[in-house]
Amino acid sequence: MPSVKVRDNEPFDVAMRRFKRSCEKAGVLAEVRSREFYEKPTQERKRKLAAAVKRNSRRLKKERSRFERLY
């Protein structure tokens, strides 16, 4: 759990912003959302595989476009 120490003469808004940023970096909200409902192991594998395929296709698309521009 992220924690933030409020500095001397620091406004509450600034401390709150720092806390929100640290929570976002730690992935707290994403973790809560993913654990909100039970996901079967097969569904989790399918979701992760689909994300990997999407990432790979994006990477290949970037590589192809980079090589096309060279000539």
From Swiss-Prot:
GO molecular function annotations of the record: structural constituent of ribosome
Pfam families according to UniProt: Ribosomal_S21
Biological process terms in GO annotation: translation
UniProt keyword annotations, A-Z: Ribonucleoprotein, Ribosomal protein
An example Gene Ontology CC term for this record: ribosome
Family stated for the protein in its record: Belongs to the bacterial ribosomal protein bS21 family.
PANTHER family: MITOCHONDRIAL 28S RIBOSOMAL PROTEIN S21, SMALL RIBOSOMAL SUBUNIT PROTEIN BS21
Protein name in UniProt: Small ribosomal subunit protein bS21
Organism: Dichelobacter nodosus (strain VCS1703A)
